[in-house]
UniProtKB/Swiss-Prot annotation:
It comes from Lontra longicaudis (Neotropical otter). The keyword Transmembrane helix applies. This is Cytochrome b. Its main location: mitochondrion. It comes from the Eukaryota. The gene is MT-CYB. The cytochrome bc1 complex contains 11 subunits: 3 respiratory subunits (MT-CYB, CYC1 and UQCRFS1), 2 core proteins (UQCRC1 and UQCRC2) and 6 low-molecular weight proteins (UQCRH/QCR6, UQCRB/QCR7, UQCRQ/QCR8, UQCR10/QCR9, UQCR11/QCR10 and a cleavage product of UQCRFS1). This cytochrome bc1 complex then forms a dimer. One of its GO terms (biological process) is mitochondrial electron transport, ubiquinol to cytochrome c. It is a multi-pass membrane protein. Component of the ubiquinol-cytochrome c reductase complex (complex III or cytochrome b-c1 complex) that is part of the mitochondrial respiratory chain. The b-c1 complex mediates electron transfer from ubiquinol to cytochrome c. Contributes to the generation of a proton gradient across the mitochondrial membrane that is then used for ATP synthesis.
Length: 379
């Protein structure tokens, strides 16, 4: 008798995705981040659901409702801080996941890669709208500054901004619609993640060597289920350590001041995970140019597969490309630091140089080094 997990229509999908899935025998811990992102998403949806039961999306009561959650709701404080810090861990996993893809040439699966880029944009939009909901000073001014960037779009810009705001400034209508979108987007993210997996399972996973692994596959369960369980344990350990010991470490103190349209904070800045893009935005004097650079900083990933010049897939055996990759990582850390600094000398010039270097590495240096490595190997 055939096992029910191989015959039942629903069980078969789960079986082919998580149990009998043929996986390369040599994938490292860098391949854990897909499952960790899934766990992050589940944590965010569950904690968000419980927060939404007590939150009110009205400008007069939003801030108070968050205070009420932390003070009066049973374990409300832990749910709120798990949600806030869960977002930070979500982005850490996202950046490491994308970095893994860049390093090992996983972008050579174009459908999976492009869905991944759409996922990244969607998660960033979700996180931005979530940051507005507590209606603190940084929530309000962050929403004002970032939505205002759309006014740089020629001809329709101003109308577009007022349409998004639902009025002539960030107000009650804006908060209500941001809450609506923040609630629905994670479910769209879940659907996109399923499509991401669907495309991945069409080709099978890449592996550190970049060589096709069809001749050496192992079943996903028990090998990688156990490996993913260890990753999940470490992720939850990191999250709970952050939540229970320093829940406000990654937040902005200004967000504990209720939103006041008449008082601008000295330094308006987004959450830490957007600082690199914010630094690129600020490094260009023109408003429209800055907005374009901001969008390009992420969408540039879409043309990475077209710029792959090396005869090898990953960077495992390409020391020159490895140097460039780690230079890119250092550059992104520099941009993150600059994004949190005031707009004054020497931060302006450092930000501009780091922004130029970011695009130069991805668009010029990496393809050029790929060609050089081919010629060094006489390929």
């Amino acid at each position: 008798m055939t096992n029910i997990r191989k015959t039942h229509p629903l069980a078969k999908i789960i079986n082919d995705s998580f149990i009998d899935l043929p996986a390369p025998s040599n994938i490292s811990a860098w391949w854990n981040f897909g499952s960790l992102l899934g766990i992050c998403l589940i944590i965010q949806i569950l904690t968000g659901l419980f927060l939404a039961m007590h939150y009110t999306s009205d400008t007069t009561t939003a801030f108070s409702s968050v205070t009420h959650i932390c003070r009066d709701v049973n374990y409300g404080w832990i749910i709120r801080y798990m949600h806030a810090n869960g977002a930070s861990l979500f982005f850490i996993c996202l950046f490491l996941h994308v970095g893994r893809g860049l390093y090992y040439g996983s972008y050579m699966f174009p459908e999976t890669w492009n869905i991944g880029i759409i996922l990244l944009f969607t998660v960033m939009a979700t996180a931005f709208m979530g940051y507005v909901l507590p209606w603190g000073q940084m929530s309000f001014w962050g929403a004002t500054v970032i939505t205002n960037l759309l006014s740089a779009i020629p001809y329709i810009g101003t109308n577009l901004v007022e349409w998004i705001w639902g009025g002539f400034s960030v107000d009650k209508a804006t908060l209500t619609r941001f809450f609506t979108f923040h609630f629905i987007l994670p479910f769209i993210v879940s659907t996109l993640a399923a499509i991401h997996l669907l495309f991945l399972h069409e080709t099978g996973s890449n592996n550190p060597s970049g060589i096709p692994s069809d001749s050496d596959k192992i079943p996903f369960h028990p090998y990688y289920t156990v490996k993913d369980a260890l990753g999940a344990l470490l992720l939850i350990l990191a999250l709970m350590t952050l939540v229970l010991f320093s829940p406000d470490l990654l937040g902005d103190p200004d967000n504990y001041i209720p939103a006041n349209p008449l008082n601008t904070p000295p330094h308006i800045k987004p959450e830490w995970y957007f600082l690199f893009a914010y630094a690129i935005l600020r490094s260009i004097p023109s408003k429209l140019g800055g907005v374009l650079a901001l969008v390009l900083s992420i969408s540039v990933l879409a043309i990475i597969p077209l710029l792959h010049t090396s005869k090898q897939r990953g960077m495992m055996f390409r020391p020159l490309s490895q140097c460039l990759f780690w230079l890119l990582v250092a550059d992104l850390l520099t941009l993150t630091w600059i994004g949190g600094q005031p707009v004054e000398h020497p931060f302006i010039i450092i930000g501009q140089l780091a922004s130029i270097l970011y695009f130069a590495i991805l668009l010029i240096l990496m393809p050029a080094v790929g060609i050089i490595e081919n010629s060094l190997l006489k390929w």
